Amino acid sequence: MTVEETLAELVSIDSVSKRSNAEIIKYLAARTEALGWRAKTFPYRDERGIEKVNMIAVAGTDAEKIEVELALVGHTDTVPFDAAWTDALRLTERDEKLYGRGACDTKGFIAAALTAIERIDLRKLRRPLALVFTADEEVGCLGAKELADAHALSARYSIVGEPTSLQPMRAGKGYCLAEIILRGREGHSAYPALGASAIFRAARLVRRIEIIAEELKAEQLAAFEPPYTTLNVGIIQGGTAKNIIAGECRFTLEWRPLPGQAAAYLLDLIRAAIEDEKSRDADFDCSLEVIRLDNGMETAKDSALVRLLEEVTAREAGTISFGTEAPQMAEMGAEAVVFGPGNIRVAHRTNEFVPLEELRECVEILSRAIERFCL
């Protein structure tokens, strides 16, 4: 089966994050088991009670504890698609580009990995190899976190599939989210002294957060764009009517820490700002809930995996600022590199696509990596 045919079958399976991914995992298990691989599933239920499944397919070892030389990692879920995109689940080719939901992010990589392993004579494997297929990457890398928490896998090297236009990415920023809630006291807006505005309190805190965001620019890594930890207040909600003093205001805080900077570092700065506001206003009522706290990752320039991918692509390893499952693979012991066909800038949009030439080239590159580390 060609890589294009495999991608067409993967795209035809609706695996939007809000649904169970059991169907696509069943397909992947059948494909790998037919080649003599051992497929082990790790089911769990998300916060809505929907069944999700991670899977690790292993070759070269029968040990119960999965320890491998190289792991190829791809997430099976996709973002939703607009109903007007009627061909979202049917792979279509135009101008040497393959269109379909997930074609770029990240079913193209999965198709390339499946095609690459079909070339392997398992009898010649000298070191174990794994394919790792995860759920819920698009909603917080939850599947990969399940695997890391369960110590389901140990790997020396890992290629984490994401659309990087076939440029190896050896370092990435972390991704963190928190919700901050401020409470005041409702009252008629004509009589401000009778209430306390939660929105005014939020505004004071947001201003302090803006100052912190500027201060974070002092610590920089030139390889990143932008080269500092970014901080954003993306959502803010408060009040119930124009003539009522707001009793509550909440906002979402997002930050992307540089590798080497603890994800919790910024939390300490925010909490210090909150405590300072409380010292100035005894009624300052504020709570902070951490939603996601993922550290950045960095694999050394002289890593054998980095050097190999630089050699076969003739491109210097770079860095990324978007979230991936590389930090979870690093937790499981791997020197991780993010890599795959397609461009992140066309992911998540209607008419997402992967260039056919890149898809085919990815098969060759993954084959080279398998040959280098496992054969």
Give the label of every model feature segment.
Residues L72, T92-E138, E179-L182, A193-A213, ...:
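Alpha-helical metal-binding/catalytic segments enriched in His/Glu/Asp
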Residues R170, L177-L375:
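Metal-dependent amide/peptide-bond hydrolase catalytic core
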